[in-house]
Amino acid sequence: MGRLFGTDGVRGVANRELTAELALALGAAAARQLASGSAPGRRVAVIGRDPRASGEMLEAAVIAGLTSQGVDALRVGVLPTPAVAYLTGAYDADFGVMISASHNPMPDNGIKIFGPGGHKLDDGTEDRIEALVGDAGPRPVGAGIGRVIDAEDAADRYLRHLSKASTLRLDGLTVVVDCAHGAASSVAPRAYRAAGARVIAINADPNGLNINDNCGSTHLDSLRAAVVAHRADLGLAHDGDADRCLAVDADGNLVDGDHIMVVLALAMREAGELASDTLVTTVMSNLGLHLAMRSAGITVRTTGVGDRYVVEELRAGDYSLGGEQSGHIVMPALGSTGDGIVTGLRLMTRMAQTGSPLSDLASAMQTLPQVLINVTVADKATAATAPSVQTAVGQAAAELGDTGRILLRPSGTEPMIRVMVEAPEKDIAQRLATRVAEAVSAAR
């Protein structure tokens, strides 16, 4: 059996790989590891979920695991992942648990665990939790068993926190918000309206089965059409758990996480808020971001893929902005993890501050043509290190020289290898990416 924890918690098809039994065992193991050193008194874990149908089953199982170890479960209901992270700190809980598979299809689900203060766990802590899975250990009885408490004020507390993200009123801005029929369906429109924007919410009617179904940050067509139809200033797309945000301008053109980071980095540097004039991003960010930041005199620190690694670098260097091309944007002053709604508020604040349309702000970065091909494989390690694959990568890199780059990356959550190529021309990137992808496919 491989490692349970991937780059973003434990994921799998609900009731197949991610069973109620495993969820119970993970809840109990997390309780033993993360609440064992707590001060005297009741131990508490915050637990939330996105609206997918299997979340109810898994929430019940995790709560059973928590309470079996004497930990009280503070249930916050359907809220975004960053809300659970924030509330873990706000309620002074020992740790937090979010049940979500983010942008994945509805049949999938996942379990993310946050430590004290709402920070994602490091690899070592995850390994220690995993080692305890299946080891029930001592169990309390009687009054020592944990209780379940519903946090009635959770959404309102999170909304008050979100209000800090917008330093200017957004009156006059019209935004279309695609909530992906996910965890943001209630709170995102409320947050944007509270800041003054005129909000048109789409895909905001979750029924447990329609999350991420041709909508949200991975399917932007309906958002583009709605922005143009309503003559909105911009559109914002969240994923199922609202830890990411992508945007489209008034003409429906994509403004991805790289462009958003450039816009926010320039704004924060202008305000004296960009610590050490440094932006943290991952190896997936487009070369155009690096060129734009170099031109502006801003240093770029690069990490592995996954917002947890961005957060680790932000904390290590005491930096103030980081993120991913996929739309996970992290601002430590406003949260311990990526928050799509905070990102949307900050982006609109910059528009209100400058009076500029999003297209003008995003033009500070020119994207190099990029091709990304996902290749399904049986064994990620074997396929990635095969001599034939390494030869194909070397040949492509030699052809590109310093005019582009190639990246071969095993997915942290799915059985696939991602082949990414950037080049001066799209046809060059497509040709080289296809060649390498064919080598990976043949080696799988």
Swiss-Prot record:
Sites of Phosphoserine modification: 102
Tagged with keyword Thylakoid: no
Enzyme Commission code: 5.4.2.10
Taxonomy, superkingdom: Bacteria
GO biological process terms on file: carbohydrate metabolic process; peptidoglycan biosynthetic process; UDP-N-acetylglucosamine biosynthetic process
GO annotations of cellular component type: cytosol
InterPro entries, alphabetized: A-D-PHexomutase_a/b/a-I, A-D-PHexomutase_a/b/a-I/II/III, A-D-PHexomutase_a/b/a-II, A-D-PHexomutase_a/b/a-III, A-D-PHexomutase_C, A-D-PHexomutase_C_sf, A-D-PHexomutase_CS, Alpha-D-phosphohexomutase_SF
Cofactor note: Binds 1 Mg(2+) ion per subunit.
Enzyme class: isomerase
Keyword Magnesium found: yes
CC cofactor: Mg(2+)
Post-translational modification note: Activated by phosphorylation.
Active-site residues from the entry: 102 (phosphoserine intermediate)
The reaction(s) this protein catalyses: alpha-D-glucosamine 1-phosphate = D-glucosamine 6-phosphate
Pfam families named among the record's database cross-references: PGM_PMM_I, PGM_PMM_II, PGM_PMM_III, PGM_PMM_IV
GO molecular function, one term: phosphoglucosamine mutase activity
Chain residues that bind Mg(2+): 102, 239, 241, 243
UniProt keyword terms in alphabetical order: Isomerase, Magnesium, Metal-binding, Phosphoprotein
Similarity comment: Belongs to the phosphohexose mutase family.
UniProt function note: Catalyzes the conversion of glucosamine-6-phosphate to glucosamine-1-phosphate.
UniProt protein name: Phosphoglucosamine mutase
Annotated organism of origin: Mycobacterium avium (strain 104)
